[in-house]
Amino acid sequence: VMTSGNLSEEPIETDDALAWEHLDAAGIADALLGNDRAILSRYDDSVVRVVDGAVMPVRRARGYAPQPLSLPALDDTTPCVLACGPQQKATIALTREDADGHAACFVSQHIGDIENGATFDAWSAARTRLESLFDLAPAALACDMHPSYLSSQWAREQAREHNLPLIEVQHHHAHIASVMAEAIA
């Protein structure tokens, strides 16, 4: 059995020595297949389903992220919004207006559950990489309304520090909106 080199609820390891140390200490690996290529960005395997002959991503990661979802623009100016994601099964999304006047929504790879410092660091690295890759600086932040989520705490702090609009979204509303966005994209 091959695994991505991380413990459950931990981010994918980017260093062979650390991966071996963590997997061996947990007693779940007999060997490690490594490589001398640097891992610049943590991408897990994508999970898809085929429905009526069409591939439907369940978890966007390798091969699907950060491909944009094309959404209708709400008005003449679609600001760059950074959606910070939930605590569990987290991703990040950035929007911008594309050349056709639609909103392009760039969704990050699956990051995992943001419950510890290592996973929050992976979340932060994914956010920085997404902003850098598309040369985008958020004009507004969106986060879950839950007061204890690390991503929401970060968004609230950044909104205060940089005087950015903050859009707090109820968790179940975000689920519905994401399903609708994927359905029309």
Residue ranges and their predicted role:
Residues 1-185:
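Acidic, glycine-enriched active-site microenvironments
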